[in-house]
Amino acid sequence: MVKRMFCLNALMPAVAFFGVLTLRADSVSFVSVDTTSVAGTSGFLDFTFDPGPFLTQNAFASVAAFSTDGAVGAPAVSGDVTGTLPPSIILNNDTPFNDYFTAFTFGDTLSFTLTLGGPAVDSPDGVAASGSTFAFSMFAGDGSTPVLTTDTLDGFAFTVDISLDGTTKLTNFSDPTSVESAVSAVPEPATGWLCGVGMALLISLRRYYSAVMPR
């Protein structure tokens, strides 16, 4: 009985060790918009990614795999934004206003993959006092009248907020817009190494337990 209790007690730290491991991954969403109701009209698409008013941890928003049967025009870019649509752009929250505003002739559909990542998502520091927000909007030809959304104040089709703990919150104002979340299963390198060490520890303890316990 003493040997049994010793082995069980030895296993407990390893079990606890595994219990506190968490996998951190970027937030990935697949976005598609049914634009048939405004097909053939001229307008604009707007992508923004801005930090909050207080101390904000670094993060980025990637818009990739952009596809449409409409036509993309020339963009107006503000802040820390790189790339061109199509195929992809990256917006960083390094400046107060980061915006990619592009002319667009609507077709029947448009789609893209949205990825939110960086330290604010992967490794929150507990020091930041504000999160960051990604927003996607569609406007009519005057550049200010929202289309395909119930948000007539700001014109957002949807927003995704990054919270202080690295989680994300979606708010969708647009019935024709589908935003489906997908979770990446790739752990941080350090986490993968710790998992390997923990597994080896459990195997060793199990072998020891089998050796010392009477059959």
Language-model features, listed with the residues they occupy:
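A broad, structure-centric signal for solvent-exposed, well-ordered loop/edge residues
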Residues: 8, 42-45, 98, 193
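Generic marker of residues within folded, mature protein domains
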Residues: 15, 21-23, 37, 102-104, ...
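Short, threonine-centered small-residue motifs that mark membrane-proximal processing/anchoring sites
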Residues: 2-27, 178-200
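Mature, soluble, non-transmembrane domains
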Residues: 77-185
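Extreme N-termini of proteins with methionine-enriched Sec-type signal peptides or N-terminal signal-anchor
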Residues: 1-2, 213
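Generic "edge-of-domain/loop-turn" microfeature
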Residues: 38-40, 54-56, 119-121, 143, ...
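C-terminal membrane-anchoring or membrane-association module
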Residues: 203-215
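N-terminal segment immediately downstream of the Sec signal-peptide cleavage site
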Residues: 25-72, 177-185
